[in-house]
Amino acid sequence: MTTKISRRTFFVGGTALTALVVANLPRRASAQSRTINLYSSRHYNTDDALYDAFGEVNLIEASAEELIERIQSEGANSPGDILFTVDAGMLWRAEQAGLFQPVRSGKLNERIPENLRHPDGLWYGFTQRARVLYYSRDRVNPADLSTYEALADPQWRGKILVRPSSNVYNLSLTASRIAIHGEPETRRWLQGLVGNFARQPEGNDTAQIRAIAAGIGDVAIANSYYYIRLQKSTDPADQEVVEKVSLFFPNTGSGERGTHVNVSGAGVLKNAPNRDAAIAFLEYLASDDAQRYFAEGNNEYPVIPGVPIDPVLAAHGQLKGDPLNVSNLGRYQPDSARLMNEVGWQ
């Protein structure tokens, strides 16, 4: 069973309500219990059934920033067992705050590819999301698309759509370029990319896809699952967008590294009162059943090779992901923010 405490319940009302909520969570479950206290920034209701199949999950939901701050303020008395969040950059922030403890699990190390987990076992990726390109079917020949780097070419002047630089997905994409190419080359790429923006960055990933359909720009950078949601929607407006926009996997040509991938990941918190159950929960998330559920529930890519992908997503082709260890997405995040600010990506 999942007991859910939403962001609104958890944070509205200030310290008194927060203290009351935390006090109501069990500090330690019985030795035989499969009970954990899960702090999660994954805002997908489809996850609830997955948690129910594990055991008793007391779920506290908020943004990653709020949860990290909360865990820090709770200190040694925190009831939290696991932090589950989107983006390796956010996992890095929690890591830098000293919130995780290393996990030694042969099952996790065997199941989860090395590039999708922390080198020291502080956290593990459990879903993948690709940051892909979207393009206008009417105005763009897909043969003209190739790589993220090529989006800085003059032919795309006034045609590129993307979220603001503060978005962690863009910070992580830029961090991957720094890890691969170094800072000077990444700066040049960013300068060209910003010069090609169709408008000042605004909105979320779905807004970029919709802006292509509206004729505001021709090419957008956004995560893979947002378009799949539109494809599955019964809203005629969403179907109109799908008819006008297609998906493209960049950096997958001969000799290319592969498309940038990021993860949703989780780690056991330093003061976890239910450590054994927390590790069991992580191992459960790496099971074939849980991986299939992630794929079907939120249109994400499983991290376990061989687990079936959602058929609508699979219809776009096989993902060739960049093998870069995703821990680099956090390591270079401060440099990403600085460079993006310096070149005027607002």
From Swiss-Prot:
One of its GO terms (molecular function) is metal ion binding. Disulfide bonds: none annotated. The keyword Iron applies. Transmembrane segments: none annotated. Fe cation binds at H43, Y44, Y169, Y225, Y226. It is found in: Cellular thylakoid membrane; Periplasm. Disruption phenotype: Cells grow normally in the absence of iron; double knockouts of this gene and futA1 (slr1295) grow very poorly in the absence of iron and have a marked reduction in their ability to take up Fe(3+). Predicted to be exported by the Tat system. The position of the signal peptide cleavage has not been experimentally proven. One of its GO terms (biological process) is iron ion transport. Induction: Transcript levels increase when cells are grown in the absence of iron. Periplasmic levels increase when cells are grown in high NaCl or in the absence of iron. Pfam families: SBP_bac_8. One of its GO terms (cellular component) is plasma membrane-derived thylakoid membrane. InterPro entries: Ferric-bd, SBP, TAT_signal. SUPFAM superfamilies: Periplasmic binding protein-like II (SSF53850). It is a peripheral membrane protein. Coiled coil: none annotated. Belongs to the bacterial solute-binding protein 1 family. Probably part of a periplasmic ABC transporter complex futA1A2BC (TC 3.A.1.10.2) involved in Fe(3+) ion import (ferric iron). This protein and futA1 (slr1295) are subunit proteins that have redundant or overlapping substrate-binding functions. The differing subcellular locations of futA1 (predominantly thylakoid lumen) and futA2 (predominantly periplasmic) suggest they may fulfill different roles. Plays an important role in protecting the acceptor side of photosystem II (PSII) against oxidative damage, especially under iron-limiting growth conditions. PANTHER family: IRON-UTILIZATION PERIPLASMIC PROTEIN, THIAMINE-BINDING PERIPLASMIC PROTEIN-RELATED. This is Iron uptake protein A2. The lineage of its organism: Bacteria, Bacillati, Cyanobacteriota, Cyanophyceae, Synechococcales.
